[in-house]
Amino acid sequence: FCRIGRKAMIGGLSGVDRDVIPFAIVTGERGKLRGLNVIGLKRSGYAPEVVKAISRAFMYIFKGKEDNFETRVQKARKLFKDNDMVQEQLDFIEFSLKGRRNVMVAE
């Protein structure tokens, strides 16, 4: 089994074999993390600055080139300490990293 985070969007017929972070979009026959559900966040009434912070955190964690994934997650915890939604994503990721399924990462 895997977990699907809050407000995540999974494309129809997408195979998901890892945990999907909150606010993510996954598409493809073999599901791949494509980005954030920005439109869904805006439609849900989240402030533009909150959506922007989530996007910056996503880019830092999943698209960053420095360090390894786990180190970027730890650094993001400090960089985005004032944003509860980013902290929710980081909690989800850290829980997944301890589990058997792991978290889906962007390619």
Predicted features along the sequence, with ranges:
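Terminal amphipathic alpha-helical/low-complexity segments used for targeting or macromolecular assembly
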Residues: 29-107
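Structural signal for interior beta-strand "rungs" in well-ordered beta-sheet cores
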Residues: 1-32
